[in-house]
Amino acid sequence: MSKYYKIAIALAVSTFAIGTTEFVPVGMLTDIAKDMHVSTGMIGLLVTGYAIAQAVGAPIATSFVGRIARRRLFTWLMFLFAVLNVASAVAPSYGLLLVTRAFTAVVHGVFFATASVYLTNMAPLDKKGEAASWLFGGLTVATVFGVPFGTYLGDVVGWRATFAVVGAMGLIGWFGVLIQVPKSVAPSVSDNQLLGIITVIRQPRISLTLLMATLGFGATFVLYTYIRPYLQQVTGISTTSVVWVLVLYGVFVTIGNVIGGRLANRQSLHILMGVFLAQAIVQIVQLMLLPKAGWYLLGVALLGLVAFMGNASLQSRIIITTTELAPAHTDVASALNVSALNFGIAGGSLVGNMVMSHVGLQTLPIVGALIGLLAIGVAQLVRRY
């Protein structure tokens, strides 16, 4: 096995821990809400707030780490990630839990942004598109094993134990980076990149791609953030069954990510538009599948298949485009794309909460599909540049 693949696996192990902590509250909304004496909608902010903190904080924080060698940066980030998850496990109040989650989100964003650029630069020429799929692979495998296991652990032992275990996962990621990422890796830049944020977003091709990422990724989170109450209230399945349905979802997310990684090597905008269209169609199909016994499994599988399929293309497109238009600011551009994806999570979750509160759970797929169609419209604008 080449050194590139060993490093890719070590970074993917780290993003597995990161993906688990990002999405595991989705499966524990009811339990955390009960323990903290707040509504399920408020606990949904643990997902939305995480995404917002990452979206706002990651580009700013990333702009200050350019002088740090990658191995040192990655190990410190994973150690801090572990500490913050333990802090979440012992948080005595909802407010403090939100704070620890926010700081964890910033660490997540910086790690993912810098690791994406690092791995893309290391990849062979014909594999640069799929380099980001290794990191997204860690996130998607987290949806298969990490999130369902965390949900199960939360049901059996308590949600605090789940965060403590995720902290231990972070230490495993720290160790993997420590032994695989070479010390000789030089810092990617030699100066502060804070002004690079402005430089990057002033490029229409980049800023429109970021908007496309927000809409395209956010479309699926209108429904996914509230998939547990949807399955329990609309489909009518038990709490135990939800865990296994989340496993099914995660399996198909992983399959979709692998397919998306291969597609990313083509760097085709038409492929991204096709993914967004598929997401919209799949959401509409949920109206027919999710309420029906047995058929809801097909609905969840299709939803998982398309959910992350475009992410590797979006991440690699930003890195490669920025290398062409603003080569000194690839780390910041990568962080901005991570922000765009998380604005999508936050926006999708927030819109989903509003729809759930004022219209009803059954309307979530329709709203998600409409947002996906907006992403296709923005992709048409990107073609002009």
Where in this protein do the model-derived segments appear?
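Helix-breaking motifs and short loop linkers at transmembrane-helix boundaries and internal kinks
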Residues: 37, 69, 90-96, 107, ...
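Extracytoplasmic gate region of multi-pass secondary transporters
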Residues: 206-247
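Paired small-residue
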Residues: 9, 80-87, 92-104, 294-302
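Extracytoplasmic
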Residues: 7-43, 58, 223-228
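Conserved MFS/SLC helix-loop-helix module at the cytosolic interface between two early adjacent transmembrane helices
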Residues: 56-95
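Cytoplasmic helix-loop-helix junction between adjacent transmembrane helices
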Residues: 94, 100-139
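C-terminal membrane-cytosol helix-exit motif in multi-pass small-molecule transporters
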Residues: 167-186, 379
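A late C-terminal transmembrane helix in Major Facilitator Superfamily
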Residues: 321-359
